[in-house]
């Protein structure tokens, strides 16, 4: 036994010496390889049977870039990510170079926690490091009795390289450091099964950052994260030393992370080196330039149209071959001018036209029902509240909910017609549960006004749609007379005709949310219950939804972690605190979030950007560019 221990220690010493010499000779090669790191696409084209996704797109990702990948829902962002991860699974034109040392990390939108995996957070994050350590020890054990060491030495070197590449010698301290950055430093001994969904998502991000430090792809890692966890995700992203490619529509992350932007629209891709705020300024400049070019194009088109009309008139009076040739040439030129009208795939974006309507009943028709306002655009939230005073549509009194523990306890609040209210708080505090119970209206602690028409947007799309059926089939009960009407209606929500014949289960998360909004719009409800309505939605659709909510004359109760939507649309907030709901003004809510999470310089820059956007918007409407 003692002799075996000596042999093993001797073998480990030999391995260490061999590894040291090999590692020293390889250091130059590793530096060269580091310089080679890249993801590069050159004139890449790819199509689905019903849609062109990419038309000769090109981009490059190199060392230590933190890149945001943006674009409207359904443009093919997730497909491009999958092409990078599994290029051999796709038939495409052009070139796609994936030259990344080591494993490519991937954080999915969704993770299913193995309920039977009773391990602590620390042990879960240690798994890959422990596996490699055990493999190294096994090789050393085999060396103690092996006659030939060359193959074992190669195996040892390979495993040791993997271990060193992920900083394995310091993995325990690195785990604790990452947990601290994510504000989870007290969680290392917690069981995975006891974590909330947001906490588990952060653990997944930490895990990938530790075992795939060179390059990580994240597909909407922010979905359903509460604001504290979103801020933790921001800190993890900003502290990471490797390259990141992150699909996100989250405006908080976009405004506070990333030094490169990839923007995919209309089968084309634009690459921008700089921050998201800088990119938005560039888009505004592009919009002005496009407007000026479009004005010049229209002037030239109009001039040639008049020439064509004159030549046609002359041709009817005089039968001349010369006149005929001149007319034909001018018509051809006019067609070319029409075809080449200045377009920009990153400015001319087909945006959703979200509209929300009430049943338009007067307040006399139903006791406690929504008042019949006629001009929401000119009515402030304060005026709405005053007009609807004492028209209570919802009363919640001593509402409690518990699962394995008490979540909400004796919650009491009420809402009046026309009010727009957000429930805000950490994950796992019962927000979705109370919203669902209000919709079901079968809890004695909840009272809705008689005959109030209520619509509900769920996080779980399967609660609303039969996902195995087509989009068209799911809208047959929405009050349309023909399939053609359904197609035309859904086009206003960004759905091209071919998508209408797809099964709902094949749509992206953002498209499913758009579909729910389209269906809710047809219901003409007086009271909207919206559970995370901006999740998965692209930024353009988020803004369209905000405008629709502002114009909507009915009442809204919304669960959301999106600061911008809450701050821009709501009258006040119900903040989850100590199992109660505390009423908070929007001004106080803004101040609380700004103080804790927003950089002052960013806020000043954002304000300047808004002022510039407003000036440009007015100039575009007036046609003035001075």
Where are these regions (language model features)?
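Extreme N-terminal basic, low-complexity initiation segments
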Residues: 3-6
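ABC ATP-binding cassette signature C-motif
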Residues: 8, 13-15, 19-290, 365-626
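Short, charged, amphipathic alpha-helical segments
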Residues: 153-157, 321-328
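Intracellular alpha-helical coupling/juxtamembrane segments of multi-pass membrane proteins
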Residues: 283-311, 327-341
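Short E/K-rich amphipathic alpha-helical oligomerization segments
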Residues: 307-313, 617-620
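Short intracellular "coupling" helices and adjacent cytoplasmic loop segments at the cytosolic face
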Residues: 312-324, 342
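Amphipathic heptad-repeat alpha-helical coiled-coil/stalk segments that mediate oligomerization
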Residues: 327, 344-383
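Proline-centered turn/helix-capping motifs that create local helix->coil transitions or kinks
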Residues: 337-348, 447
């Amino acid at each position: 036994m003692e002799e075996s221990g000596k042999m093993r220690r001797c073998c480990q010493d030999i391995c260490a010496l061999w590894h040291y010499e090999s590692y020293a000779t390889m250091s130059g090669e590793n530096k060269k390889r580091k310089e080679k790191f890249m993801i590069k696409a050159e004139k890449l084209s790819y199509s689905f049977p019903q849609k062109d996704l990419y038309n000769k797109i090109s981009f490059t990702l190199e060392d230590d870039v933190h890149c945001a990948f943006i674009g409207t829902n359904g443009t093919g962002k997730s497909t491009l990510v999958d092409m990078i991860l599994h290029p051999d699974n796709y038939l495409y034109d052009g070139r796609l170079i994936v030259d990344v040392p080591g494993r490519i990390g991937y954080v999915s939108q969704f993770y299913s926690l193995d309920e039977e995996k009773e391990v602590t957070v620390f042990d879960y994050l240690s798994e890959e490091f422990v596996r490699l350590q055990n493999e190294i020890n096994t090789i050393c054990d085999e060396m103690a009795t092996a006659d030939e060491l060359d193959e074992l030495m190669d195996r040892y070197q390979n495993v040791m390289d993997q271990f060193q590449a992920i900083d394995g010698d310091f993995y325990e301290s690195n785990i604790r450091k990452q947990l601290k950055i994510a504000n989870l430093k007290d969680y290392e001994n917690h069981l995975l099964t006891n974590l909330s969904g947001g906490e588990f998502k952060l653990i997944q991000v930490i895990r990938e950052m530790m075992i795939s430090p060179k390059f990580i792809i994240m597909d909407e890692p922010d979905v359903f994260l509460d604001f504290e966890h979103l801020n933790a995700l921001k800190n993890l992203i900003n502290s990471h030393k490797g390259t990141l490619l992150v699909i996100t529509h989250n405006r908080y992350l976009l405004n506070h992370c990333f030094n490169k932007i990839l923007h995919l629209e209309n089968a084309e891709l634009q690459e921008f080196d700089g921050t998201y705020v800088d990119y938005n300024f560039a888009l505004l400049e592009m919009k002005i330039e496009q407007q000026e070019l479009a004005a010049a194009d229209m002037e030239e088109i109009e001039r040639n149209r008049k020439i064509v009309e004159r030549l046609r008139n002359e041709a009817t009076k005089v039968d001349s071959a010369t006149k005929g040739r001149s007319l034909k040439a001018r018509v051809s030129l006019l067609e070319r001018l029409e075809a080449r009208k200045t377009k920009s795939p990153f400015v001319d974006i087909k945006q959703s036209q979200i509209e929300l309507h009430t049943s338009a009943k007067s307040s006399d028709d139903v006791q406690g029902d929504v008042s019949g306002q006629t001009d929401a655009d000119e009515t402030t939230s304060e005026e709405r509240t005053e007009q609807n005073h004492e028209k209570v549509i919802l009363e919640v009194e001593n509402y409690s909910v518990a699962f394995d523990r008490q979540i909400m306890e004796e919650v009491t609040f009420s809402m009046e017609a026309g009010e727009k209210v957000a429930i805000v708080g950490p994950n796992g505090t019962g927000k979705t549960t109370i919203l669902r119970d209000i919709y079901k209206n079968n809890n004695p602690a909840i009272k809705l006004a008689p005959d109030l028409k209520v619509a509900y947007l769920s996080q779980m799309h399967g609660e609303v749609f039969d996902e195995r059926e087509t989009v068209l089939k799911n809208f047959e009960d929405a009050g349309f007379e023909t399939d053609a009407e359904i197609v035309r209606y859904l086009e206003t929500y960004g759905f091209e005709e071919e998508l209408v014949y797809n099964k709902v289960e094949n749509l992206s998360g953002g498209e499913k949310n758009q579909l729910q909004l389209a269906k809710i719009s047809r219901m003409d409800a007086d009271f909207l219950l919206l559970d995370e309505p901006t999740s998965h939605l692209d930024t353009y659709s988020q803004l369209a939804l905000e405008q629709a909510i502002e114009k909507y004359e009915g009442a809204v109760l919304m669960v959301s972690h999106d600061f911008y939507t809450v701050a821009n649309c709501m009258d006040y907030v119900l903040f989850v605190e100590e199992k109660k709901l505390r009423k908070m003004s929007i001004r106080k809510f803004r101040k609380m979030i700004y103080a804790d999470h927003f950089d002052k310089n960013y806020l000043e820059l954002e304000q300047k950007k808004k002022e510039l956007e407003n000036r440009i918007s007015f100039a575009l409407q007036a046609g003035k560019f001075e």
